[in-house]
Amino acid sequence: MIIWLAELLQPYFSFFRLFEYLSFRAILSVLTALGLSLWMGPRLIKRLQLLQIGQVVRNEGPESHFSKRGTPTMGGVMILAAISITILLWANLSNPYVWAVLAVLMGYGAVGFVDDYRKVVRKNTDGLIARWKYFWQSAIALIVAFALYAYGKDTAATQLVVPFFKDVMPQLGLMYIVLTYFVIVGTSNAVNLTDGLDGLAIMPTVLVAAGFAVIAWATGNVNFSQYLHIPYLPHASELVVVCTAIVGAGLGFLWFNTYPAQVFMGDVGSLALGGALGTIAVLVRQELVLVIMGGVFVMETLSVILQVGSYKLRGQRIFRMAPIHHHYELKGWPEPRVIVRFWIISMVLVLIGLATLKVR
């Protein structure tokens, strides 16, 4: 929105030329989203407390979590508001990639909102019935997948980039839709599974978004994309503003979500943020790099799959509890230790993911 206003005022005020620079708008995006989150945080927390919208803790969960019962939840509303307002202010709204991410962010946010609402109002830890949750997640992902395929059919936008190989970029054809579906839905649920400890999900989300900001910038730059042997996608550069909005909003939320948490993001936040990260990965053609950079999310998801599979096939559990962060809690690790160590792992994995752009 601001970029359109700046274009009108440039002939009269040279200062507005600054808004042409992606780097300047990216900085403003971080600061705006951070500022909005910090401003909304205390107000939202107070409102949630007045409405008695508190976390419902499963009885079969770790005993240490019982003290979290009643902590305000649905704080993801603050994250989504900060991201959306920031994007509308600083992004180029004529860019279709921006709207694709916003569509998934708000669509999955709506699904998460209904899920959280059912939990806190009915005091039911199950929330939205699983089949309906997956139905709406699938519907949104497929609509976006078909739209993106129709827009970029048989171009670099539908190629698969394989890390560590310089020119291995097969054209996916209709398989692009299948891959897009699984990446968006899978990442959404993976972030949701990770969101079990104070600050555990939001910091890896911030780190992965920061990594994708770098990738989006390189992908949208004709010289760097050629140098790194990745597809040149001119629309991708505007995703830098989207990624930095996620970074800023995430850091602002972490201010209140750090241990001991004053508020939880709930499914409204985790499902939406995961869906947004998956969509960004698809748009910059780095789905496989997402697996590396989002390794913490992958690890959490695999621990659940292995736990359920092992119990059904052998009648035995591999971990004391899944997702795996609960396993370490039950081993005696204090919650802050689990959180910070997972953050460190995430930071290392993001750096490895970025290194794959050059190591080919």
Swiss-Prot record:
Pfam families: Glycos_transf_4, MraY_sig1. It catalyses: UDP-N-acetyl-alpha-D-muramoyl-L-alanyl-gamma-D-glutamyl-meso-2,6-diaminopimeloyl-D-alanyl-D-alanine + di-trans,octa-cis-undecaprenyl phosphate = di-trans,octa-cis-undecaprenyl diphospho-N-acetyl-alpha-D-muramoyl-L-alanyl-D-glutamyl-meso-2,6-diaminopimeloyl-D-alanyl-D-alanine + UMP. GO terms for cellular component: plasma membrane. CDD domains: GT_MraY. Its EC number is 2.7.8.13. The chain crosses the membrane at residues 21-41, 73-93, 94-114, 132-152, 168-188, 199-219, 236-256, 263-283, 288-308, 338-358. InterPro entries: Glycosyl_transferase_4 (IPR000715), PNAcMuramoyl-5peptid_Trfase (IPR003524), PNAcMuramoyl-5peptid_Trfase_CS (IPR018480). It is a multi-pass membrane protein. This is Phospho-N-acetylmuramoyl-pentapeptide-transferase. It is found in: Cell inner membrane. Pathway: Cell wall biogenesis; peptidoglycan biosynthesis. Keywords: Cell cycle, Cell division, Cell inner membrane, Cell membrane, Cell shape, Cell wall biogenesis/degradation, Magnesium, Membrane, Metal-binding, Peptidoglycan synthesis, Transferase, Transmembrane, Transmembrane helix. One of its GO terms (molecular function) is metal ion binding. The keyword S-adenosyl-L-methionine does not apply. Catalyzes the initial step of the lipid cycle reactions in the biosynthesis of the cell wall peptidoglycan: transfers peptidoglycan precursor phospho-MurNAc-pentapeptide from UDP-MurNAc-pentapeptide onto the lipid carrier undecaprenyl phosphate, yielding undecaprenyl-pyrophosphoryl-MurNAc-pentapeptide, known as lipid I. Its cofactor is Mg(2+). GO terms for biological process: cell division; cell wall organization; peptidoglycan biosynthetic process; regulation of cell shape. Belongs to the glycosyltransferase 4 family. MraY subfamily.
